[in-house]
Amino acid sequence: MDARSLSGILTEVREKRPLVHHITNYVTVNDCANVTLCIGAAPVMAHAHDEVAEMVAMAGALVLNIGTLDHRQVESMLAAGHRANELNIPIILDPVGAGATRLRTETAKTLLHKLHVSVLKGNAGEIATLAGAEGKVRGVDSAGVSGDPAEFARGLAEKLGLVVAVSGATDIVTDGKRLIYVDNGHEMMGKLSGTGCMASSISGAFAAASKDYVTSTAAALASFGVAGEKAAKRCEGPASFKIALLDEIYRLTADEVAHNIKVRFA
């Protein structure tokens, strides 16, 4: 595994143009749709219980995001997730705010228990909570953890048999055996609501293109980070950064990712 093989997944996404089915929050739904389009995939935002099983059958990946949670949405997530599992369609779960309230924490645990999730992507506080470690979450943001995020991510990945991605200044991706650190990104990405959700959407597109979910997730986060670095060079603040970020994702090439990727293997 090297920079060239990671960057090549972007090319596969654009060649395959997979459909990425989202059941996500209403705060960032438009951002997630746009970033999915810009990376080269096709989004569909369908949450009605009566159609999700039918819709996910057409998709290359399913992204579940609990950012604006209610019980009807959970029922739709389970219905779509069960159908995705039947068809071997990868599921990316973003457990937004797990650790902040009992509803969010228990919902994330229920989804992990009842579905075979391929990639669990969250901030350090969310992942620590789900790993049984001490994590602090304020609203939907991590407010600190006790211990090494890489170690509790690795333990959780091994226990559940999935890939865990921990977002932060340095992203961590592990399946319990392999461990990848991704150092791409820019602090402006933390000044904008929705960048974590957008990263989950890109992870879904990459998972649809490559069944090695450690590699695909690391490539997705690195590609998003490279675009963020490029966007930060020509913005004046969060609003212009958002527009520049979408533009840079749209313009991003595999060669640019290969030349600018910052990954470490442990």
From Swiss-Prot:
Keyword DNA damage carried by entry: no
Keywords: ATP-binding, Kinase, Magnesium, Metal-binding, Nucleotide-binding, Thiamine biosynthesis, Transferase
Pfam family, one: HK
Gene Ontology MF terms: ATP binding; hydroxyethylthiazole kinase activity; magnesium ion binding
Binding site for substrate: M45, G194
Record carries keyword ATP-binding: yes
A GO biological-process term: thiamine diphosphate biosynthetic process
EC number: 2.7.1.50
Catalytic function, reaction form: 5-(2-hydroxyethyl)-4-methylthiazole + ATP = 4-methyl-5-(2-phosphooxyethyl)-thiazole + ADP + H(+)
This protein's pathway: Cofactor biosynthesis; thiamine diphosphate biosynthesis; 4-methyl-5-(2-phosphoethyl)-thiazole from 5-(2-hydroxyethyl)-4-methylthiazole: step 1/1
Ligand binding (ATP): K121, S167
Cofactor(s) essential for the protein: Mg(2+)
The protein's role, per its UniProt record: Catalyzes the phosphorylation of the hydroxyl group of 4-methyl-5-beta-hydroxyethylthiazole (THZ).
NCBIfam families, A to Z: PRK09355.1, thiM
Family per similarity comment: Belongs to the Thz kinase family.
Protein name from the UniProt record: Hydroxyethylthiazole kinase
The organism of origin for this protein: Methanocella arvoryzae (strain DSM 22066 / NBRC 105507 / MRE50)
Gene field: thiM
